[in-house]
Amino acid sequence: MTLNLNPLETNLVNLVIVIGLLFWFLRGFLGGILERRRAAILQELQDAESRLKTATENLSQAQSELAAAQQKAEKIRADGQARAAGIRAEGEKRTISVMAAIKAGADADAEADAARIKDSLRREAALAAIDKALAVLPARLDASAQAKLIDSTIKNLENA
């Protein structure tokens, strides 16, 4: 073997050897680093997909629960409105009934007062007529008229 002292050829061989060694060494080293990084990225992607799937399922479940809660709230609101309308109608009926009873009571009181006043006026009119008749009677009734009146009254009593 002869020693090659040509620097161009020597550097070229050295460069090929160094590049070959670097390629062989770095391929294993960088390949391992890149493979670990690739595995970590794939694992993170799988975790993200799993979290996305779980979040989607949770969202779907929450939306269905929300829809059910909204339906229940709507039913409760409708029931409340119906109950309020029923209570309002019952209150109106009760108020009308009480007002009718009060009016009937007032009418009965007014009729009773009117009847009492009529009776009182009749009594007063009868008493006034009796007083007037008693005042006028002695002057108009002489002995023969009195005898006629007594005879007529006796006949009426006998016929009765």
Curated annotation (Swiss-Prot):
Bilayer-crossing regions: 15-35
Record's GO cellular component terms: plasma membrane-derived thylakoid membrane; proton-transporting ATP synthase complex
Membrane association type: Single-pass membrane protein
Keywords: ATP synthesis, CF(0), Hydrogen ion transport, Ion transport, Membrane, Thylakoid, Transmembrane, Transmembrane helix, Transport
A Pfam family per the record: ATP-synt_B
Subcellular location(s) of the protein: Cellular thylakoid membrane
Presence of the UniProt keyword Ligase in the record: no
tRNA-binding as UniProt keyword: no
Organism domain of life: Bacteria
Record CDD domains: ATP-synt_Fo_b
Molecular function GO labels: proton-transporting ATP synthase activity, rotational mechanism
Known partners and oligomeric status: F-type ATPases have 2 components, F(1) - the catalytic core - and F(0) - the membrane proton channel. F(1) has five subunits: alpha(3), beta(3), gamma(1), delta(1), epsilon(1). F(0) has four main subunits: a(1), b(1), b'(1) and c(10-14). The alpha and beta chains form an alternating ring which encloses part of the gamma chain. F(1) is attached to F(0) by a central stalk formed by the gamma and epsilon chains, while a peripheral stalk is formed by the delta, b and b' chains.
Role noted for this protein: F(1)F(0) ATP synthase produces ATP from ADP in the presence of a proton or sodium gradient. F-type ATPases consist of two structural domains, F(1) containing the extramembraneous catalytic core and F(0) containing the membrane proton channel, linked together by a central stalk and a peripheral stalk. During catalysis, ATP synthesis in the catalytic domain of F(1) is coupled via a rotary mechanism of the central stalk subunits to proton translocation. Component of the F(0) channel, it forms part of the peripheral stalk, linking F(1) to F(0).
Family: Belongs to the ATPase B chain family.
Protein name: ATP synthase subunit b
